[in-house]
């Protein structure tokens, strides 16, 4: 995770904040161009770099500076991480045989890589907020020796009133982008309807309009919302209620 944050800084983003942007950038790069450079420099030979990753790695390969270079760095970084994840999962299933896996830590927000887990385990559970906040809850439960049922992620500040379903539908079918702030806020970094920007994906320019409002890069991915019974008509791969896997 620390290394992934360092690479986030290397492509000009904010470490410990923009790792999800790096993950999105990876889809637009060549993962093979710099794969062995990154793997060899950071994990095999250059100990100095390994010991100082908390300071970032802006000094690594200053010759790489174009936009496509940044996309290629992101793609190679994602591939290296997924290679490491394969190794760890293979070790886990070999030495601790089970159908079940619980995945925690900030890296568990990497939904592109998370889908790999189903190659090794039948049942995978990831805390909706798997970073430090989710780990803190786990520590408390371990200390108190209690079990809880996490039925949803709406644990934050509550805005009183009825959820405006009909009003939202009216706005969406008019090809408008709807900002929603209702009910309890989501616990974690992702929005699930209570603090969200919602849009009808059938709009021709809807993607660009949302990006303009959010002031974000054009390559950033979107999270579709669909009823469970229709998922298999449009997507393959594991389903997720909390934006934890990709199709």
Predicted feature locations:
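Flexible beta->alpha loop and helix N-cap segments adjacent to enzyme active/binding sites
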Residues: 1-51, 109-110, 114-247
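Conserved hydrophobic/aromatic pocket- or pore-lining residues that grip, position, or stack substrates
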Residues: 7, 85, 106
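Gly-rich Lys/Arg/Thr-decorated short loops/hinges at beta-loop-alpha junctions or inter-strand turns
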Residues: 56-76
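Generic alpha-helical structural element
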Residues: 66, 74, 78-81, 199, ...
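Short glycine-centered, acidic/aromatic-flanked micro-motifs in structured strand/loop junctions
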Residues: 75, 105, 126-128
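Phosphate/ATP-binding catalytic cores across multiple sugar-kinase/actin-like superfamilies
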Residues: 75-101
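A general "terminal functional-core" signal
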Residues: 80, 104, 108-110
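Short glycine-rich phosphate-binding loop at a beta-alpha junction
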Residues: 97-106, 179
